[in-house]
A protein has these predicted regions:
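Active-site residues of response regulator receiver
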Residues: 51, 79
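Conserved acidic segment of CheY-like receiver
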Residues: 1-12, 16-20, 33, 48, ...
């Protein structure tokens, strides 16, 4: 899990990063929302500690851009200048927590650990759903799906299993419907989710 810290007050952000690292957590600092939006890999699970008041792009605007991009990890806002409107907007957009600067280290650690626990629980739920869908396939469909995800073409799968290519196509099509995937890339992502 990766904790992203976005704050234009670099000494403050570095101090938070050091605190998190000292607790055995992975953390990275971005000095601006723009740099964060350019550099971050949203596929890496974790959370975001986001300063509200930054030049150019504030925390609420950053959160909105993240939502537009499909961001799904918890956002913990930090601000020295919280007001009711800002807090309401942040929480309506799905903020996990709002902390007032300066924040006590134990309060920050508790908020981060709580947000990471939410991520773990969500990932476990997703994993259970994926495994349940996979278990709903027939044995033959499971064989074909695994071979297809490994990159084998229908004819190669047919040769390996001693069945016709048409039979492979029928089982593969049925499996795609059951797993709610539409293409090989989605199938491979599904299998990765199941194996994680």
């Amino acid at each position: 899990m990766l904790i992203r810290i976005v704050d234009d007050d670099e000494p403050f952000a570095d101090a938070i990063c050091f605190l998190l690292l000292s607790k055995g957590l992975r953390a990275v600092v971005h000095a601006s929302a723009e740099k964060f939006l350019e550099e971050d890999d949203p596929s890496v699970p974790g959370c975001l500690i986001l300063d509200y008041q930054m030049p150019e792009l504030n925390g609420i605007e950053t959160q909105r851009k993240l939502l537009d991009k499909g961001w799904r990890w918890p956002v913990v806002f930090m601000t020295a200048h919280a007001d009711v409107d800002m807090a309401v907007t942040a929480f309506k957009q799905g903020a996990f927590d709002l902390l007032r600067k300066p924040v006590a280290p134990d309060v920050l650690i508790a908020a981060v650990e709580s947000s990471l626990e939410k991520v773990r629980a969500g990932m476990q739920h997703h994993h259970d759903e994926v495994c349940g869908l996979f278990e709903g396939l027939t044995n033959r469909e499971r064989q074909i799906v695994k071979l297809a995800a490994a990159g084998l073409a229908n004819q190669q799968i047919a040769d390996r299993l001693g069945i016709s290519e048409r039979t492979v196509e029928a089982h593969r099509s049925a499996a795609y419907r059951c797993l709610n995937v539409k293409c090989l890339e989605e199938l491979q992502a599904f299998i990765r989710d199941m194996d994680d």
